[in-house]
Amino acid sequence: MLTKLETLEQVYALCKDDPVRPHLPAEWRIRSGREVYALKENEDIVAVICVAYMDEVPKSERDMKWPGLDVAVFYTVWSYKKGAGRKIVLEVAKHIKKVHTNVKRFVTLSPLTEMAERFHLRNGATLLAK
């Protein structure tokens, strides 16, 4: 089940597990133009994803200062169960298409690792920059 995390306490409890951007504060992740979702199975959280809405595709984390409307940026995702990361990306994209009809593009701000690149390309992504 997909759940939007809306309180600072909910997000703070999970931020410490973020393998890519643990330095981003919980309050930054849920302020205007940003959302955090958890995927649950039997009340256990199996994956987490953080989304920022922008007007253009960011080239780096620094480019995500000001929120926008047209681009959903999945800037960090982590999972506690094999396959749950892919599942949460697909479910959140589907949810955003229904709720944020103005979003025209979905991108990830993934770290430059071979594993991340293979994962995204295998799942239909287009590499925009290296």
Please provide the spans of the model-predicted regions:
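Conserved catalytic-core motifs of GNAT/GCN5-like acyltransferases
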Residues: T126-K130
